[in-house]
Amino acid sequence: MALQAASLVSSAFSVRKDAKLNASSSSFKDSSLFGASITDQIKSEHGSSSLRFKREQSLRNLAIRAQTAATSSPTVTKSVDGKKTLRKGNVVVTGASSGLGLATAKALAETGKWNVIMACRDFLKAERAAKSVGMPKDSYTVMHLDLASLDSVRQFVDNFRRTETPLDVLVCNAAVYFPTAKEPTYSAEGFELSVATNHLGHFLLARLLLDDLKKSDYPSKRLIIVGSITGNTNTLAGNVPPKANLGDLRGLAGGLNGLNSSAMIDGGDFDGAKAYKDSKVCNMLTMQEFHRRFHEETGVTFASLYPGCIASTGLFREHIPLFRALFPPFQKYITKGYVSETESGKRLAQVVSDPSLTKSGVYWSWNNASASFENQLSEEASDVEKARKVWEISEKLVGLA
């Protein structure tokens, strides 16, 4: 996301990343529509109970066949001229109501090859955002998802499955950032909010939807977790204090509740900027652990990326006015690292669909206008043993173990 090089201006400037967790809108067929019509017709039936039963059964079977035809389609279909064509892919993008998530949703929708499920916390905001950028109505669906609530994550998965729509790609993009906070804020389950939203919510979502990805007949199934340069301490931006450091994970193991454990993963004093950076390290460790555990078995491509510094994103909207005024030109003319939301969205869309980016376990990056390349992660962000521990502790915290 966009936090990336913000720290280059000054460690005194802190960056706010708002949870872009929203939900999605139209492209699924609602079986309740069929159910309503069945009820109306059955009520109007006259005659013997046997006749009513037969007619009701016939209508039910018709509705089931109609729903199946509407929500499931083979990977390859035949066009009017008889040529084989690939069906549209279905991609879930979290935090798709603004910033990188919205730009990605738009880039994918405009290809005409994807149905985008915009998984967002604010349903109306997501609907307005999709319309404002001109996304075709039949290219997206808004569904509610609040990653700060594990119950909401489970409800989203349940609602998605009720649509009987295949899942081909999951993009874990949404995040929150509280750089100026003096005290921690907590999620519904009592976890520090940055880690709860950015890591634990996505961890549960990805674990649950992995079963859906496995079932997909799409040629290239992918699970993508957006990383950040600020959590990668082998970069200049990653070395600006406070640096990411998970320590021995004592805070994570204690539940990040600020009561019988620290609200910070490493067990230290609360720091909003560091909490965000630590959560992004967890994201990158999680991607690699998914790769090690499931790539060979499932064929799913697991990847992370840093799309560049989106200096003009709404991520910084709650920062001090001076920072908001100076940061974009600083990135454009001094560091040359500035990337527009549109360009960053195209980059993430590339990781979603480009046939040349199917390598699993990779952290993708770009240099200015250069093509994508495999970037190196820091020692901590690529620590195999720490990734295993983060995975196992996270399983317990979200109720999977």
Curated annotation (Swiss-Prot):
Q: Name where it's found.
A: Plastid, Chloroplast outer membrane; Plastid, Chloroplast thylakoid membrane
- Key words, A-Z: Chlorophyll biosynthesis, Chloroplast, Membrane, NADP, Oxidoreductase, Photosynthesis, Plastid, Plastid outer membrane, Pyrrolidone carboxylic acid, Thylakoid, Transit peptide
- Can you tell which superkingdom this protein's organism belongs to? Eukaryota
Q: Read off the transit peptide span from the entry.
A: 1-66
Q: Which GO terms describe its molecular function?
A: mRNA binding; protein domain specific binding; protochlorophyllide reductase activity
Catalyses which reaction(s): chlorophyllide a + NADP(+) = protochlorophyllide a + NADPH + H(+)
Pathway recorded for this protein? Porphyrin-containing compound metabolism; chlorophyll biosynthesis
Record-level GO cellular component terms: chloroplast; chloroplast envelope; chloroplast outer membrane; chloroplast thylakoid; chloroplast thylakoid membrane; cytosol
Briefly describe its induction: Circadian-regulation. Not regulated by light.
Q: What happens when the gene is disrupted?
A: No visible phenotype at the levels of the whole plant or chloroplast ultrastructure; due to the redundancy with PORC. Porb and porc double mutants have a seedling-lethal pale-yellow xantha phenotype at the cotyledon stage, contain only small amounts of Chla, and possess chloroplasts with mostly unstacked thylakoid membranes.
Q: GO annotations under biological process?
A: chlorophyll biosynthetic process; photosynthesis; response to ethylene
Q: Which residue positions does Pyrrolidone carboxylic acid occur at?
A: Q67
Matches recorded under CDD domains:
LPOR_like_SDR_c_like (cd09810)
The family database entries (SUPFAM superfamilies) matched by this protein are listed as:
NAD(P)-binding Rossmann-fold domains
Instruction: Supply the EC number(s).
Output: 1.3.1.33
PANTHER family in the record = PROTOCHLOROPHYLLIDE REDUCTASE B, CHLOROPLASTIC, PROTOCHLOROPHYLLIDE REDUCTASE C, CHLOROPLASTIC
Under the subunit heading, UniProt states: Part of the FLU-containing chloroplast membrane complex composed of FLU, CRD1, PORB, PORC, CHLP and HEMA1. Interacts with CDF1 in chloroplast.
Quote the function comment for this protein: Phototransformation of protochlorophyllide (Pchlide) to chlorophyllide (Chlide).
Additional free-text comment from the UniProt record: The presence of TOC33 is required for the import of PORA into plastids in cotyledons and true leaves.
- Could you say which protein family the record assigns here? Belongs to the short-chain dehydrogenases/reductases (SDR) family. POR subfamily.
- Which NCBIfam families does its entry note? LPOR
What is the protein name for this chain?
A: Protochlorophyllide reductase B, chloroplastic
Organism, as annotated: Arabidopsis thaliana (Mouse-ear cress)
Q: What is the lineage of its organism?
A: Eukaryota, Viridiplantae, Streptophyta, Embryophyta, Tracheophyta
